Regions:
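Hydrophobic packing residues within well-ordered alpha-helices of enzyme cores
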Residues: 103, 126, 154, 216-220
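S-adenosyl-L-methionine
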Residues: 1-129, 133, 179, 262-300
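Acceptor-substrate binding/catalytic loop of class I
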Residues: 120, 178-185, 236-246
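Short, hinge-like loop/turn segments at secondary-structure boundaries
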Residues: 131-133, 155-161, 248-252, 280-282
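Glycine-rich adenosyl-binding loop in Rossmann-like folds that engage adenosine-containing cofactors
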Residues: 52-76, 136, 141-197, 285-289, ...
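Short, glycine/acidic-enriched loop or turn micro-motifs at the edges of active sites
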Residues: 94-96, 120, 145-147, 209-213, ...
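Conserved acidic-Pro-Pro-aromatic motif
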Residues: 192-299
């Protein structure tokens, strides 16, 4: 019992020291970013969490991951534990490339990362970040996925608003509608584009398109029906779904019909099974859908 208490105290102290180190790092980063902003410059530095160089624009949304806290650590933990060298990662709604860069490092040059981001400001930073890290296995496209091939009007956010880029009306409570401009964007039907570009299998797909997720999934239905996508990491929000005329349950039922199990992404990237009667109580946040053939590999 004494031994257990001893190691418990050591672990507590170790965690406290780590938190203090993180706080010191974020404080130092805040000072560096303020200095860059005063000079009207962007900053190139290591982004905490993914530990890769990124262009840090003083006004971009993702500066919170540089100056305040590690952005979506649960998602990073899951990716770190499950994505392997040589595999394929598809990022729909890649923004400035936080996850695409992380996955490019993990899958190594033998793997493939495909990133789609329609927004002007976000895509420009995504392009810079790819060049900065010299990731030849990262393909970037200023376009989006949808239910069909078409050119649509897209709301592209200014610095600080880029995370709220959307095909729909800007309704997020943290977004300022006057900070967006409308630009024409090419949408591709996902299954068709992937077939044309010789993408036979996707080991992990991330989907975050501010409410348009259901339309993207409908355009990729064949890929899910044949379970050519092993895992899907998706942000589900009731409010954003309503803006596109559907309920999150529509996503859940569609993917279950295709043979996928539904999980909430918990602490340290652990998968927490969600049951049938949870459909009407979908919580905001990141969810994981895993093909039945992959279930036993992903619950640990």
């Amino acid at each position: 019992m004494k031994t257990l208490k001893f190691f418990s105290r050591r672990l507590t102290r170790a965690i406290a020291r780590r938190l203090q180190l993180d706080q010191n790092l974020f404080h130092q980063n805040q000072l560096k970013l303020e200095a860059a902003k005063a000079k009207g410059q962007e900053l190139v530095d290591v982004m905490p969490g993914i530990n890769l160089a990124m262009v840090i624009h003083p006004d971009m949304y993702f500066k919170i991951g540089y100056t305040k806290y590690i952005f979506e650590p649960e998602s990073l933990d899951f990716i770190r534990d499950h994505l392997q060298p040589g595999q394929t990662f598809l990022d729909i709604g890649a923004n400035v490339g936080y996850f695409s860069l992380f996955c490019s490092k993990i899958v190594t040059p033998s793997g493939r990362v495909i990133a789609f981001e329609p927004g002007d400001f976000a895509f420009n930073l995504l392009k810079k970040n790819k060049e900065l890290n010299k990731f030849n296995n990262l393909e970037i496209h200023q376009a989006g996925f949808g239910e069909k091939d078409e050119i649509v009007e897209f709301n592209s956010g200014a610095p600080g608003m880029e995370v709220y880029n959307s095909l729909g009306k800007i309704i997020h409570p943290s977004a300022a509608p006057d900070k967006f401009k409308t630009i024409p964007v090419q949408l591709f039907r996902g299954s068709t584009w992937l077939q044309k570009n010789n993408v036979q299998h996707i080991d992990l797909m991330k989907l975050d398109v501010e409410g348009g997720e259901y339309l993207v999934l409908k355009g990729m239905l064949e890929m899910f029906q044949s379970q050519k996508i092993s895992r899907l990491l998706i942000e589900i929000t009731d409010e954003m779904s309503k803006a596109f005329g559907y309920h999150p349950s529509d996503i859940i039922l569609m993917l279950r019909d295709c043979g996928y199990n539904w999980f909430k992404l918990g602490s340290y990237g652990r998968l927490e099974p969600l049951l049938e009667n949870d459909i009407s109580k979908v919580s905001i946040g990141n969810h994981m859908f895993v093909a039945v053939s992959q279930k036993s590999k992903n619950q640990s």
